[in-house]
Regions:
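Short, low-complexity N-terminal intrinsically disordered segments enriched in polar/charged residues
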Residues: 1-31, 127-130
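Residue-level preference for beta-strand/loop junctions
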Residues: 5, 66, 80, 98-100
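Short, solvent-exposed coil/turn segments at beta-strand boundaries
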Residues: 28, 32, 78-80, 106-113
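Short beta-strand edge/turn micro-motifs at domain boundaries
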Residues: 104-127
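A solvent-exposed, acidic/Ser-Thr-rich amphipathic alpha-helical stretch
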Residues: 30-78
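Hydrophobic/aromatic beta-strand elements that line small-molecule binding cavities or substrate pockets
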Residues: 70-75, 87-89, 101-107, 117
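Short, cysteine-centered beta-strand-loop-beta hairpins and adjacent loop/turn segments enriched
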Residues: 90-98
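Short hydrophobic/aromatic-rich beta-strand segments that constitute the beta-sheet cores
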Residues: 35, 84, 115-116
Length: 130
């Protein structure tokens, strides 16, 4: 799958993930993708490989929420990196809602996402879990 730009790749990744098009978003990722979720997030830490990221981290993390949305607002091309700013919104299993800004940094190599790093105010998300 070849995209015009790294920004286009990341935009399509968010769309495919939102629409649960697993085959599409998995194809956009390197087999050995490194996914670094903020330490204060539920199940935060570093995960390596598609299986660990998408079959362990995401199901475990999302199991804390009735709704969890990552809403990208701005995409910035930085050569082999793309920075995305936006907001998370959702409702925890404790019926507490939250909205918090995020920054995501993606590293792209050979038209595949090889690394992800998350920056957000994890305290607001943690408060919704209490």
């Amino acid at each position: 799958m070849k995209f015009v730009s790294n920004v286009e790749l990341i935009k399509k990744f968010y769309t495919a993930f939102k629409n649960q098009q697993k085959d599409i978003f998995l194809d956009m990722c390197d087999e050995k993708i490194q996914w670094q979720s903020a330490e204060g997030m539920p199940n935060g830490g570093t995960y390596v490989g598609k299986q660990e990221v998408f079959e362990k981290y995401f199901p475990d993390m999302l199991s804390n929420f009735k709704e969890f949305h990552a809403i990208p607002e701005q995409f910035t091309d930085m050569n082999d990196h793309v920075m995305v700013t936006g907001k998370y919104s959702g409702i925890s299993n404790k019926d507490k809602s939250f909205e918090v800004q995020f920054s995501h940094v993606y590293h792209i190599q050979d038209n595949k996402i090889t690394r992800f790093r998350q920056f957000t105010d994890t305290q607001k998300i943690q408060e919704s879990l209490k």
